[in-house]
Regions:
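Transmembrane alpha-helices and adjacent helix-loop boundaries
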Residues: 1-187
Length: 187
């Protein structure tokens, strides 16, 4: 639902159809998934305290450099925001500096999404490939399978959705919102 809000803001109010929003949300989800995989430790199928199970299965000898730090929640939470934000900034800067608009921007954002899909689905990069990241055990010390944890995650998700809605509403009703509508109407 937060993804839908973001698409509504950029497409409905700015008139910019970006098909890359899913990729940015997936990057954030993968960052949190990497944290959850690091929390499994020796409780995994192969009992390796350092490597996630899929890396043991694929004969990795050491943890890739970009997995370091994901054993700490604060680092993973920072990466959830930072990695997609930096990619969106770089991609947006290049696209808008080149004055790519309309259907061409939509095609380029879809191509970026597909490129990320291919990168994450290859087992060569250490992201789990087609198997993805599975068998999560706990988050912040709470069992992910417990009903209480699931209920708390649901409530937190609802609160995040409500906050995102309020932020989008504040943007739309502000002077910035009028500028966004003017950008859309000028096209």
């Amino acid at each position: 639902a937060i993804l839908a809000l973001s698409i509504d803001l950029i497409w409905g109010y700015c008139g910019i159809l970006s098909l890359g929003h899913g990729a940015f949300f997936a990057l954030g989800g993968y960052a949190m998934g990497m944290y959850l995989m690091r929390q499994i430790g020796s409780r995994g199928v192969y009992g390796n305290p350092v490597l996630p199970d899929f890396m043991v299965f694929l004969n990795y000898k050491a943890l890739p450099w970009y997995w370091h730090g994901f054993d700490m929640f604060w680092f993973a939470a920072l990466m959830v925001l930072l990695v997609p934000g930096l990619l969106a900034f770089c991609f947006g800067w290049l696209a808008f500096r080149s004055r790519v608009t309309g259907v061409y921007l939509s095609i380029i954002t879809q191509a970026m999404t597909y490129a990320l899909l291919l990168a994450f689905f290859r087992n060569d990069f250490g992201f789990g490939g087609n198997n993805g990241l599975t068998d999560f055990k706990d988050i912040l010390g709470f069992n992910v399978q417990a009903q209480g944890t699931r209920a708390a995650l649901f409530v937190l998700s609802c609160l995040a959705l409500a906050l995102a809605f309020l932020i989008c509403r504040a943007i739309v009703t502000s002077k910035l919102g009028k500028v966004l509508i003017a950008i859309r109407d000028a096209e």
